[in-house]
């Protein structure tokens, strides 16, 4: 039987491994990023997906156009989340398959990546509050680690590489996955995964 302490240790190791995996391509492209303008390469608007009811983000992609790094601000209104939630998310997206062209569409059939979200507020914390025993909460309530897989399609508009497109993502996070492992008989698979739909505006 899988225990909560085992899940907690697996979670910590999981985070370290993922950060190492995603840090290597980012570091390799640091010199490229420094030479480019600070103006973002694209803007994204996302619906759902675990980072807010609606989220607005912007970010950069490398020259090979197979890695994107974005920063999002997401909002969940009180009537949906019980309290107003403001969520800051850093998302790293890897596009391992080259662009497939069909008529005027540029299709990326596979995207995958990592999202790290922080939710500020008195009811959320990174470490156990002083009035609770050590490791009372197995996961920090203010921090969420998510994984996703999806795809995107772009359509060029005008000149200078500008385009507009849409993307989808199917994802989950560490809490939902661990709860499913511990309580697979009572938790439906539909409660573990979430779907995101978004629009992407290429600026340069």
Regions found by a protein language model. Name each.
Residues 40, 51-53, 85, 144, ...:
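Membrane-spanning beta-strands of outer-membrane beta-barrel proteins
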Residues 65-69, 98-101, 158-161:
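Repeated loop/turn-to-beta-strand initiation elements of outer-membrane beta-barrel proteins
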């Amino acid at each position: 039987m899988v225990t909560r302490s085992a899940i907690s240790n697996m979670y910590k190791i999981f985070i370290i491994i993922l950060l190492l995996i995603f840090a290597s391509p980012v570091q390799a492209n640091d010199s490229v990023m420094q030479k480019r303008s600070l103006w973002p390469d694209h803007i994204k608007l996302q619906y759902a997906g675990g980072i807010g009811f609606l989220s607005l983000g912007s970010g950069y992609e490398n020259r090979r156009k197979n890695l994107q790094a974005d920063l999002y601000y997401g909002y969940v209104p009180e009537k949906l989340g019980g309290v107003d939630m403001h969520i800051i998310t850093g998302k790293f997206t890897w596009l391992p398959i080259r662009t497939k062209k069909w008529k005027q569409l540029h299709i990326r059939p596979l995207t995958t990546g990592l999202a790290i979200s922080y939710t500020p507020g008195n009811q959320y914390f990174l470490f156990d509050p002083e009035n609770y025993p050590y490791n009372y909460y197995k996961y920090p309530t203010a921090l969420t680690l998510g994984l996703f897989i999806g795809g995107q399609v772009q359509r060029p508009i005008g000149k200078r590489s500008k385009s507009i497109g849409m993307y989808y993502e199917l994802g989950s996070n560490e809490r939902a996955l661990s709860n499913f492992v511990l309580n697979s008989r009572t938790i439906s698979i539909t409660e573990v995964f979430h779907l995101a739909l978004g629009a992407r505006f290429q600026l340069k």
